[in-house]
């Protein structure tokens, strides 16, 4: 029996050795796995952080592009409105010129007539209303008579001898000029001193 007992003990020891060896191997592998996994996780986190940063930059760039696009469209819309107003005013200017000529050529005899007074006042009122409308839209007359010639605002159509006037002084305005904001819609046509 002692042999049998001895053999059993050897088998038990052998199983314990196998179990111990098996138990040691996973412990070593377990210790190695977390280290490798931690390095992989750090690399993964770094890669994700870089990707997030890249996406953030892309979003910021797209937002800036959109803001620039929006501002450009606002400028274009404002410019389009200004150009439209400018074109309409250009078309109205001959009408205003005609009213001014009509008012300046009313004979004195007609002005003295009671029957003509409502007609004259009506023409003056129409001219006044036109000018008021243009002023509200930002249109202004260019001052000319008595000023020095400025090619940015005036167009000299002729020169005359004007005693007492300095050369290039505007002595007469032939046609009124107008501005819309900073832009000249029509240059004032003027006569200047030699």
Curated annotation (Swiss-Prot):
User: InterPro entries under this entry?
Assistant: GrpE (IPR000740), GrpE_coiled_coil (IPR013805), GrpE_head (IPR009012)
* Entry superkingdom: Bacteria
GO MF terms on file? adenyl-nucleotide exchange factor activity; protein homodimerization activity; protein-folding chaperone binding; unfolded protein binding
Task: Spell out the Low complexity composition-biased ranges.
Answer: 20-38
Q: Which GO terms describe its cellular component?
A: cytoplasm
Location in the cell:
Cytoplasm
Region annotation Disordered: where it falls in the sequence: 1-40
Subunit structure of this chain's protein: Homodimer.
What is this protein for, i.e. what is its function? Participates actively in the response to hyperosmotic and heat shock by preventing the aggregation of stress-denatured proteins, in association with DnaK and GrpE. It is the nucleotide exchange factor for DnaK and may function as a thermosensor. Unfolded proteins bind initially to DnaJ; upon interaction with the DnaJ-bound protein, DnaK hydrolyzes its bound ATP, resulting in the formation of a stable complex. GrpE releases ADP from DnaK; ATP binding to DnaK triggers the release of the substrate protein, thus completing the reaction cycle.
**Stated name of the protein:** Protein GrpE
Q: Which organism is it from?
A: Chlorobaculum tepidum (strain ATCC 49652 / DSM 12025 / NBRC 103806 / TLS)
Ranked from the top, the taxonomy reads: Bacteria, Pseudomonadati, Chlorobiota, Chlorobiia, Chlorobiales
Q: Which gene encodes it?
A: grpE
């Amino acid at each position: 029996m002692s042999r049998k007992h001895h053999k059993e003990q050897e088998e038990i020891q052998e199983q314990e050795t196998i179990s111990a060896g098996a138990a040691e191997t996973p412990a070593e592998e377990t210790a190695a796995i977390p280290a490798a996994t931690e390095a992989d996780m750090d690399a993964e986190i770094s890669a994700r952080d870089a990707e997030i940063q890249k996406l953030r930059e892309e979003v910021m760039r797209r937002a800036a592009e959109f803001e620039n696009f929006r501002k450009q469209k606002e400028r274009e819309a404002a410019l389009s409105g200004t150009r439209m107003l400018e074109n309409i005013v250009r078309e109205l200017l001959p009408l205003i010129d005609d009213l001014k000529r009509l008012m300046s050529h009313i004979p004195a005899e007609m002005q003295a007539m009671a029957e003509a007074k409502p007609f004259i006042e009506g023409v003056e009122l129409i001219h006044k209303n036109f000018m008021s409308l243009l002023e509200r839209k930002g249109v202004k007359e260019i001052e000319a008579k008595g000023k020095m010639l400025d090619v940015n605002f005036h167009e000299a159509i002729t020169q005359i001898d004007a005693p007492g006037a300095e050369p290039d002084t505007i002595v007469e305005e032939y046609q009124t000029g107008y501005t819309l904001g900073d832009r000249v819609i029509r240059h004032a046509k003027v006569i200047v001193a030699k």
